[in-house]
Amino acid sequence: MRSNTVILAALPLVASAASTSGNWGGGVNYSKIFGGGLSANASIHYPGQPDYNTTTVQRWSTWAEPTFAVTIKPATDEDVQYIIRTANKYNLTFLATGGGHGGETGFATVKHAVNIDLSNFKENVLDLEANTLTVGPGNSFSAFETNLYNAGKMVPVGNAFCVNMIGATIGAGVGPYQGLHGLVIDALRSVRLVTASGDIVTASDEENPDLFWAVRGAGANFGIITSATYEIFDAPNNGNVVLAEFAYPGSVNGSLWQLLESWGETYPKEMGLTMSASYSQTTGTTSSSASLTYFGTQEAAQPWIDQLLALNPTQWRNATLPWSEVSQNSGFGTGASVCATGKYNNHPSVGAKQTSVSTYIEVFNQYVEIMKARPWLTSALVVQRFNTTATLAVPESKRGVYPGRDFSSLIILENYYDGPRHDADVYRFSKKLRSQLVATSGFDSLQTYINYAHGDEGPEVWYGKDNLPRLVQLKRQWDPEGKFGPGNPIPLA
């Protein structure tokens, strides 16, 4: 999920864990199969029940979504263990849901599955003596950010406050503060997870280190994480961040890309930046924008802000906020809107290590013409910029799987539209635009960040060609039947 421009019918009765009543989904009595072995605080829910959409996690995007015959909300690690072992016994497909933000084509292959909704796992422990934060998969970034800020601490986080912390972590976790302490996986110190066989294991540098390596970037393929512990850091500038946002006419987009290119190696580690250009179907006009965060003083941020002011924004604002409140307040105060669930959207993306002004201008011009011819389409060209000093400073043995540590930018094609009847058309033009961006990305072939992936890129792109042989070996060891990771699967051969 990105910063603001910024998966059956059943009876209408919720079955408790102790219930033995006949509740059915897709011709299978899931309450009978699972109900007897769950803890008292676990529950079983069926699509079609009046409160299903409010008692279970709903997906952020309905594009390429999985379908579920039943949702089970475990309350303990042993519940997750029991669900996996029981599903294996009855040959039932299952999928774990944390925040519901995953959006790749592979999820559409999951049909009538058992949804393991992890929203009960609210563990949230700040240990200042050990300098760690331990969270469960029921927590978004916002669940712990305020506590960290109040303690004078920080941890790398993603761009949107509503995204699941562990879900973002297992894909690497890019974000506005990664210039200071690296990716979210770089702060990860251990996980507890339930494997495909239903075993509960710990993975860290000391225990199951090969599994821990794989979890950091390919975690969705190896189990269901029920707890994760992170190292935390002292927050600079008393934890306060300068947020500066700028709105411009669409004609300024080229000047924004030129500015981005000019910053090059001088781009500071304290800064996060998102630039975008879009077209309004309502007004028939284009617009562009920039959102800058600086983890430091106003004085230190001002030279960068001044360069954006020199482009004569039609609207702008400058505020100093606790780092824990920046995401919610982005988008001129509309940051929460990016978290709305149930929209139909996808986001092909490209990792880049250089800025091509002419390509960005040309791609945006083509995008505008595409949107003008398709009144059902709302799209934006989004560029997120990062300082790579901290990500590249991580020792090779500690890096995990993520192959994009040298990405200075992620370029995203955001597509919102009204449903699957347009999928083929959107894929066709998105693939063409993506290819143009790849050609001047500074890489010889398509690179991307797995949490922004479309799903067609393949495992060499998601995980890195050099990492794949070791990953395949570990996949065979820990998940030999391919139970996990349908969104971005690691092959077994």
Curated annotation (Swiss-Prot):
* Group of enzyme by EC: oxidoreductase
* Top-level division of the source organism's lineage: Eukaryota
Q: Where is the FAD-binding PCMH-type domain?
A: 63-235
Which GO MF terms does the UniProt record name?
FAD binding; oxidoreductase activity
Biological or metabolic pathway of the protein = Secondary metabolite biosynthesis
The record's induction entry says: Expression is positively regulated by the azaterrilone A cluster-specific transcription factor tazR.
Record-listed E.C. numbers:
1.-.-.-
Which InterPro entries does the record cross-reference, listed alphabetically? BBE, FAD-bd_PCMH, FAD-bd_PCMH-like_sf, FAD-bd_PCMH_sub2, FAD-linked_Oxase-like_C, FAD-linked_Oxidoreductase, Oxid_FAD_bind_N
**Matching Gene3D superfamilies, A to Z?**
3.30.465.10, 3.40.462.20
Pfam families found in the cross-reference section: BBE, FAD_binding_4
Signal peptide boundaries: 1-17
| Glycan attachment points | 29, 41, 53, 91, 253, 318, 387
What UniProt keywords are attached to this protein's entry?
FAD, Flavoprotein, Glycoprotein, Oxidoreductase, Signal
The entry's function note states: FAD-linked oxidoreductase; part of the gene cluster that mediates the biosynthesis of azaterrilone A and other azaphilones, a class of fungal metabolites characterized by a highly oxygenated pyrano-quinone bicyclic core and exhibiting a broad range of bioactivities. The first step of the pathway begins with the non-reducing polyketide synthase tazA that assembles one acetyl-CoA starter unit, five malonyl-CoA units, and catalyzes a series of Claisen condensations, methylation, PT-mediated cyclization, and finally releases the first hexaketide precursor through the R-domain.
Family note? Belongs to the oxygen-dependent FAD-linked oxidoreductase family.
Protein name according to UniProt? FAD-linked oxidoreductase tazL
Question: What species does this protein belong to?
Answer: Aspergillus terreus (strain NIH 2624 / FGSC A1156)
* Originating gene: tazL
